[in-house]
Amino acid sequence: TDETPPAADVLIAQLLAKIDARGHGHREIVFEPGRSLVGNAGVLLTEVMFLKPGEQKNFCVVDAAMNDLMRPALYEAFMGIVNTRRREGATEVWDVVGPVCESGDWLGRDRQLSVQPGDVLAVLSAGAYGMTMASNYNTRGRAAEVMVDGSQAWVIREREVPADLFKHEHLLPN
């Protein structure tokens, strides 16, 4: 399916046309347009840890996982994935998967890529719901968030470390 968020003006025009076609005079529409506003504003960067070529499938194992970006696992959402390093030569078909031992831990299936361990892949259109749907599954800290404006960048949320995951827990008294 096409996962490109619709332009707001196009979406509103289509909604109003449907409402008008049903004969509703006064109309008020309230909706939460999160993905259409910020979907394309975010990119998840992930490093290729190792490659597992196989007879039937090739797996490109990266350091990001379903806990970092849940949309592919939860909705089978298509996310564009590109290598940030231009590589010459042939590409191969890879499933881009995370290191969490779950069958749903994938970011992209059947992707034509030229990749090597150490490459950084960009998972595109990851701006909506990335952090709000992120979890600490398998004791994985959530990723850092970086705001980029032109040639400037600021860390706006630090990467979680293991101590962050346990700081709100308390032992029971003896």
Residues covered by each model-derived region:
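C-terminal helical cap(s) of enzyme catalytic domains, especially alpha/beta-barrels
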Residues: 3-12, 139-146
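Active-site-proximal beta-alpha loop/turn segments in soluble metabolic enzymes
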Residues: 1-7, 34-37
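Alpha-helix-loop-beta-strand connector modules within alpha/beta enzyme cores
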Residues: 11-23
